[in-house]
């Protein structure tokens, strides 16, 4: 087809391509000999590489604080090349070089929002930013991020002014002719994808060197006096050849003389090391000199000072145009590299300047326009990495777009970008969420796993295949299980010696290590082994990395992403006389000098500081010695974690730099996959993996529904003060899913005059620090926050955590509720949610293009939804996500009790079963068939809403009329729209449906996956179709439990007398309510902020469950003293300007109220009070002395002593009664009082049968009556166990429990063995059981006796086991006597004769 006549006329710059190709070789000029083999310029200092918005803002503020007005920083930017027409790329990296020893690289592309701190720095007019083509950078930043670069210094203008010329300088040209060096312009680095995470070492050095070059060129040009200094080398080349020859001859003679004098051996090692370095330098310079003298010259390229010339070679010209900023400065067409002929704002604004410059060049050099175009084109094309092909239609569109934008958009964009309200830009399309912690993980992972991934319709349809869906394990168990460490001592580990215990008590206030703590510490001190430590919040994982350096006297490095948490821990260590510091880029030289002198034991650093200062760590290890390196919050390393931080991925270099230093990775939430990722990323060598249980028994869990009225939802958690004002019962955090919601909740609570503040990542750092500071010091009682708050808070007395909106996954939810009750006292966690809360999460999931990661996040969200809908024990659901199916003993004492969760409390009170119908699988086959068929009938063109309208027979105009005649139209009208939407969510989660995003991220269509289409085909032949799904309350409604009126203390709810657990008096049941009181308001000048509510837990219940009951007088004394201690601590903390909880935790105050020490030495006996803390808490001793003097109560009640008046009463109580732990008491009551079968109790309380049986064995040990037959201890079972115990090899040694278990048949439960042993041990003092005689038969009690004994046992429990013989249970003869003939021992008289002293008294 002939197209010549129809071929449109191309612009001149494009039609010259063929001419350029033909003359390219001839046009190539040779570089000046002065530029041959110039040494490369490299940045010699440390590079700080930051990839998180919060860290970037923090570092930027540090830079602003350290720099003075008028200071200059080297500035540069990088962005990836674009290979498609019409596309544009955003700035990926911003470089700031503040000195010759420090350069900051901010990887903006890994951040979801532009860091506020960096924006303030770039817009700071008092700090100058120097670079080449920097004006183009200004427009680029303005266009990409709405950031206006202020006080920029164009080095081209400075150089032309100083050198008295009018040159078009590139950065490389300035480096060559000002510094006598050259930049390494490797195309593979320069044109690499700067958005990919992480940057390579070559990319880092390249980027840092560019910014460094800008800084030192500015400094060099500032010191120049005139042009002669720059061109002295050129004049020497022309005028001093004879002098140079003389110098060469002289140097050669000196070299020969040195060679003759050189000794055969070097006595000094330093000499031996330095000589090769000097010789290498001389050799390199000699080689360069040879090329300069012997190399060819070209008169056309010889430098002529003072004339208008181009100092750049062709290669340099390419380097000069490597970025859009230089292209925008010097040429319109150099935009080809990023956007082929895309007339952006910067190029349009600079067009006029380019034209003026071209005319000036033509006038000066007399060149024709074609020659100018040719030269410029040659430079532009050499700058370009890839020349894309442009079609005819695309060219027309682009040119038309250029004409329209040039005249219509420039002024509009200028006025918009320069608006003074740009900080308050409201972009309605932005999802209201905490971007710093929500989107960074998604974007960083996208860059980490793949390059550019194009989402296509077919790709999304492939995501729902059978093998790729998240597996659904029963009860949430599966590969993510973690077995917890047993709390028993590891007998293979040596006990800590006296010196180690003394160090522990002196600096940390504890008298012993917890077993898992000692396991980790011993591994570090003795084995020098890497460790992965997963410990529940509040267990004490910080001691694992703080103790070793204190004990060894060396240094411990702690890496944490949380600045505020590190500051609090440094303060806490300093209060205990442990020298510690936070080392960052903004630290003074004095602190760094003290670090090098070994004056600090624990040094906290950020991941960015660590990666940029490995040489400092190596220096510290060689000079002082590093005991360990701890990586706190290590789950941030894993891309699968809920709080992925890309900066942690760079910490793998630690083991390379310091291979002999043990590394400890610590986290409170890490499943098996996350642990493996941690080990891999940190390059740990054969690490010891230690995991404790995840249970937090002091946390009460509750879930409720939002009503839409914020005050109505939150008022149940508030209490009225005496002044009729409202307040929370203790410090409270309210988590909201978006910034907008935090502000709404704060505004509503403000109507009640509550002392609450907002906290989210959109606030300035100074504002966030103020909220954090005031919350720690109890100046505000409540913080309404996004997930940006809390992870770095060191406040142990948070009593309540409320989620006003559904969390996205179990890990983050566990982490957030874990901030409550770290002092070990009772706290509560409440979650109020609505189904719409998951809509934003689903939209975010759709945007994830990595299939594996998307399905993983979907699986996590589905687990969270099941948790919210479930009627099972919420504690069990959470723990089953982290732990193994056994759910070890840490959970047994609380699970299933009224202190556990909102599901256990009503089930316990009303004897309900745990397996309610909505948690069971239901057959939704017919409905699923209808919904999938509707999606297929509508040709997968709509979202899920239209198929639901179709099934419900809606008359909505959104449904096309042509579908209304289909036989399925209206087939599902019996179900509500919300029901169908819930079913669709289940089908999406199970992989039958998939939502496919369109161009607009809020528009998505619903399509069948391969799995869904296969099932639909198979179901069409079934009648009816079957599909089992787990129903929830949306699909199987049940009564919703609203938040309790006093949810903070579920144990305070008064139950009727018949519901009290055995052994617990009414007075004991109501201790929480009795000791809950409010501290007087804190006096504050100018504010009316209420003092935090000090909720006093029962002092009796805080200790061992077996602690004897205390008198009312003692309880009153403890309560009153505790209140005064809280108030005194607050005043003392205010004077010291430290958080009260850091000065002394509530638990310490409770112990002080019980022990009432009056001397510093006695105060040291309290657990958690170190020597340093004891001295600081001395003012509290006066409060104790004054209170005890006024109330006449005894003081200095150390752990070995008891109140004198209660000692005899306590001893008497121990003889009569021994209280049961609450969980044991609940099991005993249900079994003995309510006659529930043991297997039903175990099922109802979600306990293993053996655990429930062991509860009964403990009741037997405590002396409580028990129906042995119903418990399973039948005469036959008793005989089998007794035969094993009394015969060899046991020989009645009841301490050989393990051997007994081996010899007893496996079908007998272990608890029956323990029960039999307890019976024997309780009666061993009053009778001797003869060996079993198989010819004799024991008589089992009759049913009448059993009924009588049950009745008597009930009375015994109610009366708390009165000591009279009338209330004692009548024992069966087969327990009381071992060898009575069954035929002749039926009379009641013989029974009376065999009756002995009660076994259960």
From Swiss-Prot:
Known regulation of activity: Zinc ions stimulate the exonuclease activity.
Record-linked InterPro entries: 3'-5'_exonuclease_dom, DEAD/DEAH_box_helicase_dom, DNA_helicase_ATP-dep_RecQ, Helicase_ATP-bd, Helicase_C-like, Helicase_HTH, HRDC-like_sf, HRDC_dom
Cofactor list: Zn(2+); Mn(2+)
Binding site for Zn(2+) 2: 76
Biological processes annotated in GO: base-excision repair; cellular response to gamma radiation; cellular response to starvation; cellular senescence; determination of adult lifespan; DNA geometric change; DNA metabolic process; DNA recombination
Main location: nucleus
3'-5' exonuclease domain: residues covered: 51-223
EC assignment: 3.1.-.-, 5.6.2.4
Compositional bias per record (Polar residues), positions renumbered to this chain: 1043-1069, 1323-1332, 1382-1392
Residues where Zn(2+) 3 binds: 873, 900-901, 904
Phosphoserine found at: 419, 433, 444, 1098, 1364
UniProt-listed SUPFAM superfamilies: HRDC-like (SSF47819), P-loop containing nucleoside triphosphate hydrolases (SSF52540), Ribonuclease H-like (SSF53098), Winged helix' DNA-binding domain (SSF46785)
Cofactor detail note: Binds 2 zinc ions in the exonuclease domain. Has high activity with manganese and zinc ions, and no activity with Mg(2+) (in vitro).
This protein's UniProt keywords: ATP-binding, Chromosome, DNA damage, DNA repair, DNA-binding, Exonuclease, Helicase, Hydrolase, Isomerase, Isopeptide bond, Magnesium, Metal-binding, Multifunctional enzyme, Nuclease, Nucleotide-binding, Nucleus, Phosphoprotein, Ubl conjugation, Zinc
Cellular component, GO, one term: centrosome
Compartments, record wording: Nucleus, Nucleolus; Nucleus; Nucleus, Nucleoplasm; Chromosome
Record-linked SMART domains: 35EXOc, DEXDc, HELICc, HRDC, RQC
UniProt similarity note: Belongs to the helicase family. RecQ subfamily.
UniProt-recorded name of the protein: Bifunctional 3'-5' exonuclease/ATP-dependent helicase WRN
Species assigned in the record: Mus musculus
